[in-house]
Amino acid sequence: MNRRLVLFSAATIVVGATVLGHSQTTGDALDPVLVAADTHKVAFENAFVRILEVRIPAGKTEPRHRHPHGLSVYFSDWEAKGTVDGKPAQVNSRKSGTFAWSDAVVHTVENVGKTEGRVLLIELKY
């Protein structure tokens, strides 16, 4: 009986790790780490969150990309022009020390200000 339990447990762990690993490495064509690699860097990742360090130079427009729901923490004052799929562009002032909740989104972002945009994105995986 113990041997059967050990084999079942091992099989469950292997299958679970395979599924989890596959879900984290399956390429999303709109993943910002892939399409905007010059501005989006993974700072931390586990099964629950992915934290991105984002630095958008003044005048830079990022390609269209996707984020799941999560929290943005702003580390600089800058002007962001965001265009969400199906909606008109909107310019927002981002202030250092503030934060904002975002639902899942597909968008482009342009830094229309004169300073670098610095953001920590906390993307939730559930």
Each model region followed by its residue ranges:
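Glycine- and acidic-residue-biased ligand/ion/polar-headgroup-sensing regions
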Residues: 67-87
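Boundary at the C-terminal end of the N-terminal hydrophobic targeting segment
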Residues: 21-23
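Bacterial N-terminal signal peptides
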Residues: 9-17
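N-terminal export leaders
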Residues: 3-7
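Ligand-binding loop in jelly-roll beta-barrel domains
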Residues: 77, 104-126
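A short glycine-rich, His/Asp/Glu-containing loop-to-beta-strand
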Residues: 36-61, 68-72, 122
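Short acidic-glycine-tyrosine-enriched beta hairpin
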Residues: 87-104
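Short beta-strand segments in beta-sandwich/barrel cores
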Residues: 61-62, 78-83, 99
